[in-house]
């Protein structure tokens, strides 16, 4: 027997079936009415119906079958791709235990170096601050222990001593007998004679020097 594919039944058939007591099944959710609604009867009823209708049965249309298969294929492919991507990402994200240990060791080394450098810097800064405090304390102690500049109560101005000048008046001969004393005359007369002799000799020498050029010109 040849089975003929019948298109979807019209709406009035559904109403008739509902009146007869047959309830059509709702379409599957998410398929957007891509399947044809078929009334579900018992096996005997179906056989009788097939006999009455001359071997005709309600089957899904080719377009609805094609759309349903495509949707199933797409859903399966999407599900498989999601699983493969999640597995790949989990494999990539989870490092091996050796690499994890190396990373942890490197991080600990970097953190220990950072802490050591920070501790050294803090020690140096603390030493500088202590030295500055010591210097400030020394300056304060020096300033407080210095003697106060208290001026004396009485001022006495003293003139500097003059150097003794050489003069005949302050000589011993003048003090004893005056100008006409023997000691004064012994000193004064020879000095006077020597001064005159020197003046006379200097005059004669100058006169001779002046007379010689005039005679040579003639």
Curated annotation (Swiss-Prot):
Short name of one Pfam family: BNIP3
This protein's UniProt keywords: Apoptosis, Endoplasmic reticulum, Membrane, Mitochondrion, Mitochondrion outer membrane, Nucleus, Phosphoprotein, Transmembrane, Transmembrane helix
A cellular component term, taken from the record's GO annotations: endoplasmic reticulum
Main location group: nucleus
Membrane topology: Single-pass membrane protein
PTM field: Undergoes progressive proteolysis to an 11 kDa C-terminal fragment, which is blocked by the proteasome inhibitor lactacystin.
GO biological process annotation, one example: mitochondrial protein catabolic process
Low complexity: compositionally biased ranges: 41-50, 81-96
Subcellular location: Nucleus envelope; Endoplasmic reticulum; Mitochondrion outer membrane; Membrane
Listed GO MF terms: identical protein binding; lamin binding; protein homodimerization activity
Self-association and partners: Self-associates. Interacts with BNIP3 and STEAP3. Interacts (via BH3 domain) with SPATA18 (via coiled-coil domains). Interacts with PPTC7; this interaction promotes BNIP3L degradation.
Similarity comment: family membership: Belongs to the NIP3 family.
Function: Induces apoptosis. Interacts with viral and cellular anti-apoptosis proteins. Can overcome the suppressors BCL-2 and BCL-XL, although high levels of BCL-XL expression will inhibit apoptosis. Inhibits apoptosis induced by BNIP3. Involved in mitochondrial quality control via its interaction with SPATA18/MIEAP: in response to mitochondrial damage, participates in mitochondrial protein catabolic process (also named MALM) leading to the degradation of damaged proteins inside mitochondria.
Protein name: BCL2/adenovirus E1B 19 kDa protein-interacting protein 3-like
Encoding gene (name): Bnip3l
